[in-house]
Amino acid sequence: MISSNDFRTGTTIELDGAVWRVVEFLHVKPGKGSAFVRTKLKAVQAGNVVEKTFRAGEMVPQALLEKATLQHTYMESGDYVFMDMSTYEETRLTANQIGDSRKYLKEGMEVNVVSWNEKPLEVELPNSVVLEVKETDPGVKGDTATGGTKPAILETGAQIMVPLFISVGEKIKVDTRNDSYLGREN
């Protein structure tokens, strides 16, 4: 159990048989009446966001999530298959469970698979990944005075903005949290 006073961004709780992650929280102490905590909760499985208010100090069941480092091995009939490299046990996740993470997911990549009650819920990517640029406009000499950017399509199909000097075939480092270019990779 966790007190509503201890809510922080990223805290996971159990409500109505589902796992919810605290996205935002605000402790409110009105002049009259008792204090309360106003939260925005995101359903880990479904992805929907709801607002919920808790009394200050209210005890809520905390969802204890397990993380396992698994390797993405292949796709089969729309499912993503991950393998535990120590036990060779396979875990399957649907495209909905993976969500936006699939735009940076490639075969052979190690990721954290988050489970609750031994059911896989979601995939956590590393903060940065190295991917090859598959398609981008050529940089024109003299265009770099303002340090502009151009769109690039990566090997996984993701599209991000890169500096003008990046060309097709280069490996770049991408921040998976905000879809931004971090630099070239050798």
Curated annotation (Swiss-Prot):
Pathway: Protein biosynthesis; polypeptide chain elongation. Its main location: cytoplasm. It holds the Pfam family Elong-fact-P_C. GO terms for molecular function: translation elongation factor activity. Keywords: Cytoplasm, Elongation factor, Protein biosynthesis. It is found in: Cytoplasm. GO terms for biological process: peptide biosynthetic process. Coiled coil: none annotated. GO terms for cellular component: cytoplasm. CDD domains: S1_EF-P_repeat_1, S1_EF-P_repeat_2. InterPro entries: Elong-fact-P_C, NA-bd_OB-fold, Rib_uL2_dom2, Transl_elong_fac_P/YeiP, Transl_elong_KOW-like, Transl_elong_P/YeiP_cen, Transl_elong_P/YeiP_CS, Transl_elongation_fac_P. SMART domains: EFP, Elong-fact-P_C. Gene3D superfamilies: 2.30.30.30, Nucleic acid-binding proteins. Belongs to the elongation factor P family. Involved in peptide bond synthesis. Stimulates efficient translation and peptide-bond synthesis on native or reconstituted 70S ribosomes in vitro. Probably functions indirectly by altering the affinity of the ribosome for aminoacyl-tRNA, thus increasing their reactivity as acceptors for peptidyl transferase. NCBIfam families: efp, PRK00529.1. This is Elongation factor P. It comes from Prochlorococcus marinus (strain SARG / CCMP1375 / SS120). The lineage of its organism: Bacteria, Bacillati, Cyanobacteriota, Cyanophyceae, Synechococcales.
